């Protein structure tokens, strides 16, 4: 099939690579406009654009998917199918109806669960045991179209949003190609989504990383994993930003009675390779962190150069 591929971030770039290595032809790539990045605010290409340019494929970067000039360009290209993976913009009906085989989307959750943005992070934040990828026909409303096929993955106990992203990126491309092959031969199913089971998730923002230590330790540990690598869980230590990269929940049998003398957010014990933080329910043991102006390091490395005392209150 002659395909137009629409996508923007790293997970979409991995899917694009799979399609480029298949029997199908990518005739053009559509991605979001270049954006300033880093401290120097230099313009950076979206990951999908980098892959497309390396493969010698034309790249389109419209400000809006409904721009008339862009829609006309798609009509001239006349693709058999439009493939969408984390493009970041809703497509108008005129585009959805354009290709012979329609527009199909690669979504990083087991629909109808987690429609919308950030499904990968929310699977970890909510402590899900499994996640997966859904290939679906696109509709005018977000993530509501009929399902073609899905593939599940099991979340590890120490799964981060970053590691789950990589798992789903690995299976997303091959699953999309299987769906394309099934569509081409007329064997692709159309499974309606159960609206009663549908859930929606919102986009993440940096403020979500500010940990509230009155929450249970189990929830905070998930939060640290679910916001890794972005936007990252954090707190304050003596007025400086302290990013929290890895933690463990201290087993109940290890807890002493000293915690009764402290408030949530207090450091209640300091060891050679870790320190313990009291929460609203349970204790969190820090294993990897990053103080403002420093690199990411293990807590053991951090404690070699920083004197930390029990009773210190985080968040101030």
State what each model feature region is.
Residues 195-316:
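Internal anion-binding site segments
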Residues 32, 36-78:
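N-terminal glycine-/serine-/threonine-rich beta1-alpha1-beta2 phosphate-ribose binding loop
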Residues 1-39:
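N-terminal Rossmann-like dinucleotide-binding module
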Residues 21-22, 32, 81-200:
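Donor/substrate-binding cores of folate-linked one-carbon enzymes
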Residues 9-11, 63-66, 87-89:
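Short beta->alpha connector loops
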Residues 25, 56-58, 102:
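Conserved beta-strand segments of alpha/beta enzyme cores
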